[in-house]
Amino acid sequence: MSTMSTMSTTTAPNIPTRALANGVEMPVLGYGVFQTPPEETERCVREALEVGYRLIDTAQSYANEEGVGAGLRDSGLDRQDVFLTTKVAPVNLTHDRAAASIDESLRLLGTDYIDLMLLHQPIADFPGAYRALEEAHREGKLRAIGVSNFYPDRLADIALLTEVPPMVNQVETHPFRQNAEAHELMTSLGVVHEAWAPFAEGKNGIFTNPVLSAIGEKHGKTAGQVTLRALIQQDVIVIPKSVRRTRMEENIDVFNFSLDEEDMAAFAALDDGSFPRIFDHRDPKMIAWLVSERVRKADPSGAALY
C-alpha cells in the first residue's frame, strides 16, 4: 500500500493526500461537478469548500469551469489551499486545440495555474494533445498532468512513450467494477488511480446493497461511506458528487473509521463481472456517439480534427 500524508492545517487537516510521481500532493477525496448545472456550480463549490473539501474536479465539457472559479473565490480560501482538476474536452484533442483550451480553462477558472489537467477521452489526436499538456506543464501552467478513461493498453502506450508520463488515470471505478488488474498496471507505471462514478451513478441498488449496508451497520456508516472508504483503502482517489450539503458532509465523513480484512474481502467480492461498464470506450457505438455529439456538434463548420 502507498503512504498518505496529511494536508497542512491551513487546508483540510482531515483529508490525507497522495504524492503524485512528481511529488505534488493530491487529496485522496474530492468533490466532482459532473452534470452540475453552471448556475448551481458556484454555490455547490463554495459549500463543498466550506464543508472541508480541498479537491475540486471539473472539465471543459461540463461547461461549469467558470462557476468553479467563482466558488473558489467566494470561499475566501487561498488558491494554493485548493487542488483544481480539469480535463481537455474531446473537441480539443489535437495539439493546437488542446494548447489553446488550456489557456481558456485558466481564464474561466480565474487562476494562473491548474493543479491537474487530464485528457478526457482516448480519442482523436490524443498523442498530440498530450504533448500540449507536457509543454504547459514545463511552462508552469499545469502542476501535474494525466489522462482519463485510458484502458490498460492505451495507458501503457502513452506512459512508456512520453517525456512526462501521466501521473493520474481517472476511470470508472466503483464496488461493481474495481479494476484490480488495471490498478496493478497503474501502480507499476507510477500512475495514481482515480475513480469517477464511485457510486456507480446510483445504479445496481448501491445505496441499499446488503453487503455494503451490513459493513456500514458494523461501523455506524452508510453504504455510500463504506464505498468511499473501501476505495480509498485500495489506494484509489475518489470524487463523489452531490448538490446537497448534507450529502457533501456525509461523503467527507470517512476518515474516522477503517475497514478490516473481512470487510475488504466482502467489498472486493462485489466485483463479480456482471455489471456492465457505464461507458465502454471500446464500444464502436459509444465512440460514434461521443464523436458525433461532443466533437462534430461543437464545430459548426464540420471541420475534421486531424
Feature annotation, model-predicted:
Residues 21, 69-81, 103-110, 135-137, ...:
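Acidic (Asp/Glu)-rich catalytic clusters
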Residues 1-82, 199, 294-295, 299-306:
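N-terminal binding-site loop/beta-alpha segment at the start of enzyme catalytic domains
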Residues 36-49, 94-109, 128, 153-156, ...:
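Short, acidic/polar
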Residues 121-306:
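Beta/alpha (TIM)-barrel catalytic core signal, keyed to glycine-rich beta->alpha loops juxtaposed to Asp/Glu
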Residues 36-39, 58-67, 91-96, 122-127, ...:
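Acidic-and-aromatic substrate-binding clefts and catalytic sites of carbohydrate-active enzymes
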Residues 11-18, 66-73, 102-104, 152-156, ...:
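Alpha-helical scaffolding within the catalytic cores
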Residues 87, 91-135:
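Glycine/small-residue-rich loop that forms an oxyanion/phosphate-binding "nest" at active or ligand-binding sites
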Residues 55, 113-116, 144, 168:
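Residues at the N-termini of beta-strands
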